[in-house]
Amino acid sequence: MNLVAPTPWGLFFQDSATPQMEGIEELHNNIMFYLTIILFSVTWMMITIIKSFVNTKSPISHKYMNHGTLIELIWTITPAVILILIAFPSFKLLYLMDEVMDPSLVIYGEGHQWYWSYQYPDFTNADGEFVEFDSYIVPESDLEEGTLRMLEVDNRVIIPELTHTRFVISAADVIHSFACPSLGIKCDAYPGRLNQSSVYLNRQGTYFGQCSEICGILHSSMPIVIQSVSLKNFYYD
């Protein structure tokens, strides 16, 4: 089983576990390709121009050059083409992420100061009530060996792999944000409003996230732990 969590001095993405996060990472890499070319091209041109002026003996060698049609066309059209090449994949990914799928499982999550509560409206307990629970951070004094400080919770969200799952997010008091980087989720939680995000986990594993909206003094004490299991274990365990 995979364990995906932040690492000290981490500079790159966490391992993606959903198609939407794979799309985000691919878009990022494509944009970085264009930005790298732009960086080196502009740097080369600036250095070339500076060296040209430094090596020119006459300080008025370009006195009568007040415009250049060709270069103006180049620096107008080239950025426009680059922006189009960036925009189309970005819009495609944006609309794919917003596409409403018919989920096999719905989980309702509500942010509180400073914990999360979850409800599985598709399941009921012996009393006929919806399955629901609260998820609090595990205090540092209660951590077991091998668990993660400021990220472990007492009750994890369990979802099956290879299943379309919809998270419906809200808040009970102030604005929160339900975020799990490896799943490509960042869903704002507003009091009195419902927001949603769909996921499709490619593999089993444990994935860590946090509240990503400053919500008070214990904002950093609202971790999110999502554990993906097989469909059989989800229904029978």
Swiss-Prot record:
The keyword Phosphoprotein does not apply. It is a multi-pass membrane protein. Its EC number is 7.1.1.9. Gene3D superfamilies: 1.10.287.90, Cupredoxins - blue copper proteins (2.60.40.420). It is found in: Mitochondrion inner membrane. Disulfide bonds: none annotated. Residues 1-30, 95-237 are mitochondrial intermembrane. It catalyses: 4 Fe(II)-[cytochrome c] + O2 + 8 H(+)(in) = 4 Fe(III)-[cytochrome c] + 2 H2O + 4 H(+)(out). Mg(2+) binds at E213. Residues 52-67 are mitochondrial matrix. GO terms for molecular function: copper ion binding; cytochrome-c oxidase activity. SUPFAM superfamilies: Cupredoxins, Cytochrome c oxidase subunit II-like, transmembrane region. Its cofactor is Cu cation. One of its GO terms (biological process) is ATP synthesis coupled electron transport. The keyword Zinc-finger does not apply. Belongs to the cytochrome c oxidase subunit 2 family. Component of the cytochrome c oxidase (complex IV, CIV), a multisubunit enzyme composed of a catalytic core of 3 subunits and several supernumerary subunits. The complex exists as a monomer or a dimer and forms supercomplexes (SCs) in the inner mitochondrial membrane with ubiquinol-cytochrome c oxidoreductase (cytochrome b-c1 complex, complex III, CIII). Component of the cytochrome c oxidase, the last enzyme in the mitochondrial electron transport chain which drives oxidative phosphorylation. The respiratory chain contains 3 multisubunit complexes succinate dehydrogenase (complex II, CII), ubiquinol-cytochrome c oxidoreductase (cytochrome b-c1 complex, complex III, CIII) and cytochrome c oxidase (complex IV, CIV), that cooperate to transfer electrons derived from NADH and succinate to molecular oxygen, creating an electrochemical gradient over the inner membrane that drives transmembrane transport and the ATP synthase. This is Cytochrome c oxidase subunit 2.
